[in-house]
């Protein structure tokens, strides 16, 4: 060790344990445009002050450890440490706080969602001084955004590829999700597409099982796509799930899809992992494939209000990692999703600049600097009676996906697809004529059903189906 290094390392070093807040709680800090900002919902253990809890989060997710180490003297901690710069109590909750942490950009590898999450939500979530910890939102600086490719194509390029404008796209998940042979699966795809849907979909756990190997499924689905395209004159697609046990196998499946000439593949991005997802997104852009993203496993991470990570963070991460569609809840169906919260992260997926809006759960203004947008997919327990609400809530730039709401039609798959297409066209026309979908939705569907026996049959089957459960994850009540 040189004398110069020895002197620097030894000056001011005192072994032992010191409070995190002495180093990592800096309320005077002015955040920089290049900082990654995080909003954490922190529930400290009894007796732990909020300043110490917030500082502990900043420390353990950046440069800190449980004790003072002499190697701190070999670098500039002030340059690299995370800082808890603001703390606010959560209204209506005892001993719970929103702690804001700023991270210098040098802590993160360029173009790596994996590295970003490893730092920010790594070991800190198991920290004993905290009863619970949840990452509510991130502000990703434009300097870091620019190191990512983002979605393979984005909303406008997808519409141009499909030649479909002025309405939401329609999809359907093939059911039963497991157990069909490849040929019967392809037949179900064909019936749905010829009936008027734009897409059909592999379910998230359809990979390559003994009853249906992936290559057989790809071949029969490609045949269904081309046959339905020839009959309808519309471009069709099926989300071929390329998720696999290894990245190499995943890319091999995507290559097969490209060689078959189909327009879109699919990935389970949380179970598959961000490294695999980013690799697939790059392949899709280079080879002209659209990429549909399923969020299987998200509720393990995001459903509990006090611990984990909010889906808006996972949605931002997906836009950076890459995907052209992602499942985003329905508000009206069988899966979790409160309206204001859902619309908040739907805008984060689609828009270029999203302003801070705590009434929708958005903690920071986010500028995507022209990164392509992602189409939100509404899927799960929806049927024709939901069509007006879905059209009003999600607007044109969305995919409305009816699985049971297509395949459960009493006359079969194709009539089920016809019913959904007629309902959608009726809602879009009514909206364009200035009618109020929220108020007149049922009347609009009834009027359309007079001219479509398929829609009339669907209306009769699902007239009493509702999912009246309260959302678990709700916005905080404002302080009175």
Swiss-Prot record:
Positions of modified residues (N-acetylproline): 3
Propeptide positions: 1-2
SUPFAM superfamilies associated with the record: RuBisCo, C-terminal domain, RuBisCO, large subunit, small (N-terminal) domain
Gene3D superfamilies reported in the protein's UniProt record: Ribulose bisphosphate carboxylase, large subunit, C-terminal domain, RuBisCO large subunit, N-terminal domain
Named cofactor requirement(s): Mg(2+)
Residues holding substrate: 123, 173, 177, 295, 327, 379
Subcellular compartments: Plastid, Chloroplast
Example of a GO cellular component annotation carried by this entry: chloroplast
Domain of life: Eukaryota
Annotated positions of the N6,N6,N6-trimethyllysine modification: 14
InterPro entries cross-referenced by the UniProt entry: RuBisCO, RuBisCo_large_chain_AS, RuBisCO_lsu_C, RuBisCO_lsu_C_sf, RuBisCO_lsu_fd_N, RuBisCO_lsu_N_sf, RuBisCO_lsuI
Main location: plastid
Residues bound to Mg(2+): 201, 203-204
E.C. number(s) listed in UniProt: 4.1.1.39
GO biological process: photorespiration; reductive pentose-phosphate cycle
Single GO term (MF): ribulose-bisphosphate carboxylase activity
Record-linked PROSITE patterns: RUBISCO_LARGE (PS00157)
Processing after translation: The disulfide bond which can form in the large chain dimeric partners within the hexadecamer appears to be associated with oxidative stress and protein turnover.
UniProt keyword annotations, A-Z: Acetylation, Calvin cycle, Carbon dioxide fixation, Chloroplast, Disulfide bond, Lyase, Magnesium, Metal-binding, Methylation, Monooxygenase, Oxidoreductase, Photorespiration, Photosynthesis, Plastid
Assembly and interaction partners: Heterohexadecamer of 8 large chains and 8 small chains; disulfide-linked. The disulfide link is formed within the large subunit homodimers.
Family: Belongs to the RuBisCO large chain family. Type I subfamily.
Remaining remarks: The basic functional RuBisCO is composed of a large chain homodimer in a 'head-to-tail' conformation. In form I RuBisCO this homodimer is arranged in a barrel-like tetramer with the small subunits forming a tetrameric 'cap' on each end of the 'barrel'.
Function, in words: RuBisCO catalyzes two reactions: the carboxylation of D-ribulose 1,5-bisphosphate, the primary event in carbon dioxide fixation, as well as the oxidative fragmentation of the pentose substrate in the photorespiration process. Both reactions occur simultaneously and in competition at the same active site.
Protein name per Swiss-Prot or TrEMBL: Ribulose bisphosphate carboxylase large chain
Gene: rbcL
């Amino acid at each position: 060790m040189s004398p110069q290094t020895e002197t620097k390392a030894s000056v001011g070093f005192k072994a032992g344990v010191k409070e995190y807040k002495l180093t990592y709680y800096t309320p005077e800090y002015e955040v920089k445009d290049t900082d990654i900002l995080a909003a954490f919902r922190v529930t400290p253990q009894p007796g732990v002050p909020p300043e110490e809890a917030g500082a502990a989060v900043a420390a353990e997710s950046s440069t800190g450890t449980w004790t003072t180490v002499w190697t701190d003297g070999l670098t500039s901690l002030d340059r690299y440490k995370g800082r808890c710069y603001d703390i606010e109590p959560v209204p209506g909750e005892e001993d719970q706080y929103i702690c804001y942490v700023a991270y210098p950009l040098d802590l993160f590898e360029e173009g790596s969602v994996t590295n970003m999450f490893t730092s920010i939500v790594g070991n800190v979530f198991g920290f004993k001084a905290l009863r619970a910890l949840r990452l509510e939102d991130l502000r990703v600086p434009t300097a870091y955004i620019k190191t990512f490719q983002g979605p393979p194509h984005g909303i406008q390029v997808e519409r141009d590829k499909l030649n479909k404008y002025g309405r939401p796209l329609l999809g359907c998940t093939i059911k039963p999700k497991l157990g069909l042979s490849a040929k019967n699966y392809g037949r179900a795809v064909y019936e749905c597409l010829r009936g008027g849907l734009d897409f059909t979909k592999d379910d998230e756990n359809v990979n390559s099982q003994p009853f249906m190997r992936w290559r057989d499924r790809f071949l029969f689905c490609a045949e269904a796509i081309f046959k339905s395209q020839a009959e309808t004159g519309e471009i069709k697609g099926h989300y071929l799930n390329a998720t696999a046990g290894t990245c190499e196998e995943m890319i091999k499946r995507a290559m097969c899809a490209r060689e078959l000439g189909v327009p879109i593949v699919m990935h389970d991005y949380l179970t598959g992992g961000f490294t695999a997802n980013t690799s697939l997104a790059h392949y899709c852009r280079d080879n002209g494939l659209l990429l549909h993203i399923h969020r299987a496993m998200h509720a393990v991470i995001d459903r509990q209000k006090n611990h984990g990570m909010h889906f808006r963070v996972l949605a931002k991460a997906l836009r950076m990692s890459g995907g052209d569609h992602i499942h985003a809840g329905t508000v009206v169906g069988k899966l979790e999703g409160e309206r204001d919260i859902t619309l908040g992260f739907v805008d984060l997926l689609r828009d270029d600049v999203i302003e801070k809006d705590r009434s929708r759960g958005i903690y920071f203004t986010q500028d995507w600097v022209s990164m392509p947008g992602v189409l939100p997919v509404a899927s799960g327990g929806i049927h024709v009676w939901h069509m007006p609400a879905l059209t009003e809530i999600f607007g044109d730039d969305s995919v409305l996906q009816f699985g049971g709401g297509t395949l459960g039609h009493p006359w079969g798959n194709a009539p089920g697809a016809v019913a959904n297409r007629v309902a959608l066209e009726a809602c879009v026309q009514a909206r364009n004529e200035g009618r109020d979908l929220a108020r007149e939705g049922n009347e609009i569907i009834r009027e359309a059903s007079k001219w479509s026996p398929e829609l009339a049959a669907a209306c009769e089957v699902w007239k009493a189906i509702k999912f009246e459960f309260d959302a678990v994850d709700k916005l905080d009540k404002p302080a009175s």
